[in-house]
């Protein structure tokens, strides 16, 4: 079944603002085995010009996957999750996320297309402070694998 193209432009929001904390940053840095002191040591981060520890560059995936998850879970989108693979991920930063930031995330379906028997779903997640300052845009492309050709 094809992805419902009527969903192009549909947006999903986090149910509440997300507080970026030192603990969450450290846990994420631990999970990706990154010992960078900018993610762990407030004094080191302040010496580098930040107000507190900063999050690793891929940290926003936590927020963008929430929006993507809402889209994927919508039965009317008609996306067969058993056939989904992650195709691409990009981040466009205005500045790093820092401990103490309280942010919102709005994920929008920006493209749906077919290519070589597969379908591609692109989602853009705009992450901003609750005061409206843009921090980062996360762009996720999911590939819904088509059926294998008959006889293979």
UniProtKB/Swiss-Prot annotation:
InterPro entries referenced in this protein's UniProt entry, alphabetically: FAS1-like_DH_region, HadA-like, HotDog_dom_sf, UPF0336/Enoyl-CoA_hydratase
A Pfam entry, by short name: FAS1_DH_region
All residue ranges annotated as the MaoC-like domain in the record: 7-116
GO molecular function: (3R)-hydroxyacyl-[acyl-carrier-protein] dehydratase activity
GO biological process, one term: fatty acid biosynthetic process
SUPFAM superfamilies: Thioesterase/thiol ester dehydrase-isomerase
Gene3D superfamilies per record: Hotdog Thioesterase
Similarity remark: Belongs to the UPF0336 family.
The protein, known as: UPF0336 protein Tfu_2666
Organism, as annotated: Thermobifida fusca (strain YX)
């Amino acid at each position: 079944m094809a992805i419902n193209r009527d969903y192009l432009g549909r947006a999903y929001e986090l149910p509440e603002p997300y507080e970026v904390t030192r603990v969450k940053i450290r846990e994420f840095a631990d999970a990706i085995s990154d010992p960078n002191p900018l993610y762990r040591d407030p004094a080191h981060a302040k010496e580098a010009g930040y107000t507190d520890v900063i999050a690793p560059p891929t940290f926003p995936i936590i927020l963008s996957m929430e929006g993507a998850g809402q889209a994927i879970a919508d039965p009317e989108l008609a996306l067969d999750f058993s056939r989904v693979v992650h195709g691409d991920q990009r981040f466009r930063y205005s500045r790093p996320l820092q401990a103490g930031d309280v942010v919102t995330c709005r994920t929008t379906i920006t493209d749906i297309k077919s290519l070589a028997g597969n379908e591609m779903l692109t989602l853009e997640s705009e992450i901003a402070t609750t005061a409206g300052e843009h921090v980062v845009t996360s762009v996720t492309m999911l590939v819904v694998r088509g059926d294998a050709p008959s006889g293979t």
